[in-house]
């Protein structure tokens, strides 16, 4: 199912193109980090599950485009997904095929990966609980 069809079918706010929705991938350190972030989000959102929190392939409805366009604190990161889930935003996932990187190098070397995970965990477990919510946001 494609992302547009899923958004129309479910009336959700965000559709994530997931690498792991229906397909298993070989376990590596990146996947372990992604799963740890998935569990952190589940803990802080009352069990809401997003299987591929680090996927950058996302489709936003008009309301979400407006929110991301006007709020500088919205970034395409897992902690923002946790915040949005706690605000009542509906997020769905569909399986997509993504190819491995064929050129360039990731900025997430070992040191940067540790730093990234620390920032995400701090934000998900601490900062999101004190973050000011906009009018209409839940919780």
Residue locations for each model-derived region?
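Acceptor/aglycone-binding surface of glycosyltransferases and processive sugar-polymer synthases
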Residues: 1-74, 101-111, 115-118, 122, ...
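Cell-envelope/extracellular polymer assembly enzymes that use nucleotide-activated donors
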Residues: 79
């Amino acid at each position: 199912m494609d992302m547009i069809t899923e958004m129309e079918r479910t009336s959700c706010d965000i559709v994530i193109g997931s690498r792991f929705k229906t397909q298993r991938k070989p376990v590596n350190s990146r996947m372990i980090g992604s799963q740890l972030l998935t569990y952190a989000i589940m803990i802080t959102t009352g069990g809401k599950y997003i299987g591929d929190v680090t996927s950058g392939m996302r489709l936003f409805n008009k309301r979400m485009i407006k929110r991301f366009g006007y709020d500088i604190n919205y970034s395409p990161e897992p902690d923002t997904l946790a915040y949005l889930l706690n605000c009542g935003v509906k997020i769905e996932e569909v399986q997509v095929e993504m190819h491995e990187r064929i050129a360039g190098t990731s900025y997430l070397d070992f040191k940067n990966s540790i730093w990234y995970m620390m920032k995400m965990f701090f934000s998900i477990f601490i900062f999101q609980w004190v973050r000011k919510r906009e009018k209409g946001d839940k919780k």
